[in-house]
Amino acid sequence: MKTVINIFILFTFLASLSANAQRIKDLADVAGVRSNQLIGYGLVVGLPGTGEQSPFTEQSFKTMLSNFGITMPDKLKPKIKNVAAVAVHAELSAFTKPGQTIDVTVSSMGSAQSLRGGTLIQTILMGIDGNAYAVAQGSLIVSGLGAQGLDGSQVLVNIPTVGRIANGGIVEREVKSPFSSGDHITFNLRHSDFTTAKLLSDTINDLIEGSAKALDATSVRVRAPRDISDRVSFLSVLENLEFEPASPAAKIIVNSRTGTIVIGSEVTLLAAAITHGGITVTINEIQDVSQPNAFAEGETVVTNQSDINVSNSDARMFVFKPGVTLETLVRAINEVGAGPGDVMAILEALDQAGAIRGELVII
């Protein structure tokens, strides 16, 4: 059944949304509409003496020659320093048709010093199902540079053993998509959240009543036309609907290897006091009560007053105004000369003490 949408109602609905609203297409993917990874094994030829002499490269070279009708004696060991065995991989986007081209990445598998100046000869790219979906060939673009002296010393700029061929793969087979089957389409949120899933469902139902249903924190199922052309038009309208997603969960992400710390805007602190090495952190929470006069017809209001003090061994002291956040704490610790390791240790201690309103995630 063909779906008819009132254009006037649609634009009135879109114009009434918040300035912080985001499109559905920016928050969710359509189930079944995805890319597929392809991989293949091939040879890069034409290298200026920067290739390799590994056994599997020699075997691959002999196999390639035999495919062209050239037979080499088994005991003959060819000198092929201008050849390198490589892994070739690419991504086949959804709905890519036969005859279209895709970019491919070529990486050395052996001891080749550089792939600069090389050409990938025809390589079949296969999917996880073992079927061939594309063929790759062409000259490599290598951004890296390497140089080596006779004493074994070498200098590397970027990575010379990985190259790329723009539009170097020709698609030979299309991947079938479940997009056109069934009477429903499903939106999958990129970041699972029950509230956002409910809001997405409500937004679609405000336009087409009873058509959407939130299945869980990730998926929202929508009733859709069976005809493929109607389904495309239907989806083009839905994916441009805007709504304001729920605020993300309060999280602190800490990368222990790089020292990177990312703090969500919803993270706050409870009252706590910490001493770490020469650093002392004190957080005080004081509640003030505002009591109106007896006949003022006002309301009693309780307000929170927060004070944070940070000091180190050289007696420097930092005093902050009320409204303590974790961002303020981290900035204060950095100002007294603490490194990322100190900040991470303090965050872990605060989390163990239950003083952080949020989740601490260490990666």
UniProtKB/Swiss-Prot annotation:
Claim: Transmembrane helix is one of the keywords in the record: no
Primary residence: periplasm
Pfam families per UniProt: FlgI
Biological process (GO), any one: bacterial-type flagellum-dependent cell motility
GO cellular component: bacterial-type flagellum basal body, distal rod, P ring; outer membrane-bounded periplasmic space
Signal keyword on record: yes
Alphabetically ordered keywords of this record: Bacterial flagellum, Periplasm, Signal
InterPro entries: Flag_FlgI
Molecular function (Gene Ontology), one example: structural molecule activity
Domain of life: Bacteria
Signal peptide positions (record): 1-21
Family to which the UniProt record says this protein belongs: Belongs to the FlgI family.
Subunit structure: The basal body constitutes a major portion of the flagellar organelle and consists of four rings (L,P,S, and M) mounted on a central rod.
Functional summary from the UniProt entry: Assembles around the rod to form the L-ring and probably protects the motor/basal body from shearing forces during rotation.
NCBIfam families cross-referenced by the UniProt entry: PRK05303.1
Name of this protein: Flagellar P-ring protein
Organism classification: Bacteria, Pseudomonadati, Pseudomonadota, Gammaproteobacteria, Alteromonadales
This protein's encoding gene: flgI
